[in-house]
């Protein structure tokens, strides 16, 4: 359902959140892992701060054009995967991020962002044709593997496990995924497995008192760790990392961009 403040979206379908699909996601998510260790090493002209700055700009563009959280998450994943295999100069960094937004919006949005809008958002620092050429290069470098398992994809599975058929499921789904996209602006968070990021987001936002008593046992973090089959300490560390990333998130950083 669409509102003035939210992009059009459908209701969560429990059929798409069956255990077999969830376990398939857990199995293939390592294929899409990224790393923040490339900055200052393989990416000699880029720093982690520059990546965070670009990520914040990409988030703000999606917010301005009312794009879903999945678009931000996929665009950042595409960017970070590209940075693992291709050196990018400072001069082309924003154009590269814009190309990632262009591809991600085509895959994950009902109303993809236009090349004209992206050029405008970047203060016309590149032309439409230059952006299209950058999109082609991105697709070629990634061998057209443009989809990924995202943290925002896993949220629905975890919330259904926690909340069952709660009438507030869609509300928490939107809130958790918005938090996740803010955290993903930090490349350190993006290097974590998607399921861990999503579970940490759920742990930070979903209060224990909204979880049915027959499923709630020992706290939200241990319950989520049990669902994922991971150590509680691993998930707790991710919670702390995401809390740090979200605390550092500030759109005002763009004033110096």
Curated annotation (Swiss-Prot):
Domain of life assignment: Viruses
Which keywords appear in this protein's UniProt record, sorted alphabetically?
Cyclin
SMART domains the UniProt entry points to: CYCLIN (SM00385)
Q: Give any Pfam family that matches.
A: K-cyclin_vir_C
Function recorded in the entry: Modulates host cell cycle progression and apoptotic signaling pathways by acting as a cyclin. Forms an active kinase complex with cellular CDK6 kinase. Promotes host S-phase entry of quiescent cells and activates host cyclin A. Triggers host apoptosis by inactivating host BCL2.
Give the protein family.
Belongs to the cyclin family.
Q: What subunit structure does UniProt give? A: Interacts with host CDK6.
- What name is this protein filed under? viral cyclin homolog
- Source organism of this protein record: Human herpesvirus 8 type P (isolate GK18) (HHV-8)
């Amino acid at each position: 359902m669409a509102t003035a403040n939210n992009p059009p979206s459908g209701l969560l379908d429990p059929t798409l959140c069956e255990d077999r699909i969830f376990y398939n996601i857990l199995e293939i998510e390592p294929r899409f892992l990224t790393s923040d260790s490339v900055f200052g090493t393989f990416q000699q002209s880029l720093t982690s701060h520059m990546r965070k700055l670009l990520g914040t700009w990409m988030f703000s563009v999606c917010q301005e054009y009312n794009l879903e959280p999945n678009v931000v998450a996929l665009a950042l994943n595409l960017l970070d995967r590209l940075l693992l295999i291709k050196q990018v100069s400072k001069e082309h960094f924003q154009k590269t991020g814009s190309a990632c937004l262009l591809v991600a919006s085509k895959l994950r949005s009902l109303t993809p962002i236009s090349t004209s809008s992206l050029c405008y958002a970047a203060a016309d620092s590149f032309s439409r044709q230059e952006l299209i050429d950058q999109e082609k290069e991105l697709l070629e470098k990634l061998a057209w593997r443009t989809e990924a398992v995202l943290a925002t994809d896993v949220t629905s599975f975890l919330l259904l496990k926690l909340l069952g058929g709660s009438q507030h499921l869609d509300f928490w789904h939107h809130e958790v995924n918005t938090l996740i996209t803010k955290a993903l602006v930090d490349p350190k968070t993006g290097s974590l497995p998607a399921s861990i990021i999503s579970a940490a987001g759920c742990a930070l936002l979903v209060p224990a008192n909204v979880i049915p008593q027959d499923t709630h046992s020992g706290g939200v973090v241990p319950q989520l760790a049990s669902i994922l089959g991971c150590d509680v300490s691993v998930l707790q560390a991710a919670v702390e990392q995401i809390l740090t990333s979200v605390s550092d998130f500030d759109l005002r950083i763009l004033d110096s961009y």
